[in-house]
């Protein structure tokens, strides 16, 4: 067969993908497709969102407990103890990301996620009984170990169920659910502090104890209801499962997992795009963690009372949830990623400048709204952008783990540049966060240029992208 004919076939594949919005769906009743997708949505997204909300609360409630009296009891005001206790969680969180994702398929999502949730719930519970700063750090290390595989597993599982331009709304939906609940955790924690002295236990310790118990109970719920991968799912009938797999195969040709090899591992690990997305994810999580760990402290430093600081912490998260879903809907609707991520970077920068440099507390507080709105939407946005532009589940497992591990580096960055010495405005931390946003804008520009160029070559029959004929990058 001639090379010219090969090129014509490649161009035909591309045109079929571009012109047929739902090629695999055409064989099924649209009502059947929509009903099945709704079943998947309701079975998966609320529960995973709730579990991730608990994960966010358990990793970031240190700032709330500090304001509630832990600082005095454990002497976290000495040197950089608070920053170290916050940061040390991320070391095992980063180290165990890739190994966790590699065993996820072998172990199965239900067992894997249950072990993660119950394990970090026990670590959270233990934090309520620590007598000193050193043991607090030990519990934070255990928390990082058990949470390490959780978020990449969630992203991996969700992205195997949907077509590329359906993913960001779903990622945003479970993330939205988590940040709303996480935002109101400060008010819940404030209520728990009224248990101060009950059973001879301090109010801040009760925050860890009660939230740890809830987490362990949710681990049991995960065992009962968390869905597995599409090819292993049991809550769908055979026709529904076949339809889901056919949609994924038509969309990106990776409905069936391909075996992992060392060659595939290293190709995915050293792919420049893996690290481009990883640095973008770091740049997104850095301000999100900064708000999570320091919002209550910053608000308290504006002159608000302790009680008011707890209450006011919640509302920037509500705004972030609305913004997050709006941009996710816009991205899926337009089938564009980079431009909407860039818009959120600009919003985040504006918020950081307002919080850092405005003189009026109300304006500084409004800056936290903008910062959280810009940062939070980028977290699912970067993950969707990445998942749209790869095929093969082996590559998805490795690259997703690397990217989310770099999110842990963003957590380390946030907890170390917002230093106690810079309280209450944390100006060096503000500028470090702005630098992350500018870095992300540069990477978005580079990715867009390279993707555009390669798509043009693929349309001309000069290149096959991701070893998948007809595949085009999402820009």
For each of these PLM feature ranges, what is it?
Residues 1-54, 59-60, 68, 223-258, ...:
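Intracellular terminal tails of multi-pass secondary transporters
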Residues 63-64, 263-329, 379, 383-384, ...:
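Extracytoplasmic gate region of multi-pass secondary transporters
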Residues 63-95:
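Extracellular/periplasmic helix-loop-helix junction of adjacent transmembrane segments
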Residues 94-134:
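Conserved MFS/SLC helix-loop-helix module at the cytosolic interface between two early adjacent transmembrane helices
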Residues 95-108, 322-336:
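Helix-to-loop junctions at the C-terminal end of transmembrane segments
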Residues 111-125, 339-354:
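Structural signature of the two symmetry-related core transmembrane helices
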Residues 149-162, 377-392:
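Intracellular juxtamembrane helix-capping segments at the cytosolic ends
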Residues 168-201, 208-215, 400-414:
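Glycine-rich segments within core transmembrane alpha-helices of 12-TM secondary carriers
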């Amino acid at each position: 067969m001639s090379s010219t004919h090969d090129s014509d076939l490649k161009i035909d594949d591309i045109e079929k993908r571009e012109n047929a919005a739902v090629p695999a769906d055409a064989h099924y009743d649209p009502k059947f497709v929509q009903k099945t997708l709704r079943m998947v949505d309701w079975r998966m997204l609320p529960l995973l969102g709730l579990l991730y909300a608990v994960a966010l609360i358990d990793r970031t409630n240190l700032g709330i407990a500090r304001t509630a009296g832990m600082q005095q009891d454990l002497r976290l005001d000495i040197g950089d103890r608070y920053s170290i206790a916050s940061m040390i969680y991320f070391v095992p969180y980063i180290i165990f990301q890739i190994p966790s994702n590699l065993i996820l398929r072998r172990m199965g999502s239900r067992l894997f996620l249950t072990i993660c949730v119950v394990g970090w719930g026990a670590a959270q519970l233990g934090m309520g009984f620590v007598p000193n700063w050193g043991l607090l750090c030990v519990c934070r290390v255990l928390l990082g170990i058990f949470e390490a595989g959780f978020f990449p597993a969630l992203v991996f599982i969700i992205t195997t169920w949907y077509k590329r331009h359906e993913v960001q709304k779903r990622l945003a939906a479970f993330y939205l659910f988590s940040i709303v609940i996480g935002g109101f955790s400060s008010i819940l924690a404030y209520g728990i502090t009224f248990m101060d002295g009950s059973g001879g236990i301090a109010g801040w310790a009760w925050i860890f104890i009660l939230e740890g118990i809830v987490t362990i109970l949710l681990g049991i719920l995960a065992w009962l209801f968390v869905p597995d991968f599409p090819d292993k799912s049991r809550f769908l009938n055979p026709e529904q499962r076949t339809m889901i797999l056919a949609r994924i195969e038509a969309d990106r040709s990776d409905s069936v997992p391909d075996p992992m090899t060392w060659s595939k591992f290293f190709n995915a690990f050293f792919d420049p795009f893996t690290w481009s997305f990883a640095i973008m994810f770091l740049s997104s999580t850095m301000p999100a963690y900064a708000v999570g760990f320091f919002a209550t402290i910053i608000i308290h430093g504006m002159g608000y009372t302790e009680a008011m600081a707890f209450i006011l912490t919640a509302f920037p998260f509500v705004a972030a949830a609305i913004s997050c879903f709006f941009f996710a809907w816009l991205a899926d609707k337009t089938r564009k990623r980079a431009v909407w991520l860039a818009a959120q970077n600009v919003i985040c920068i504006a918020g950081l400048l307002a919080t850092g440099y405005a003189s009026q507390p109300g304006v500084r507080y409004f800056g936290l709204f903008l910062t959280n709105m810009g940062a939070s939407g980028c977290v699912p946005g970067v993950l969707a952008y990445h998942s749209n532009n790869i095929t093969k589940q082996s590559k998805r497992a490795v690259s997703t783990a690397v990217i989310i591990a770099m999110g842990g580096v963003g957590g380390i960055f946030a907890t170390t540049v917002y230093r106690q010495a810079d309280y209450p405005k944390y100006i060096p931390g503000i500028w470090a966060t702005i630098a992350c946003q500018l870095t992300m804008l540069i990477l978005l520009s580079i990715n867009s240029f390279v993707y555009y160029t390669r798509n043009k070559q693929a349309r001309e029959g000069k290149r096959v992208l991701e070893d998948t004929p007809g595949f085009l990058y999402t820009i």
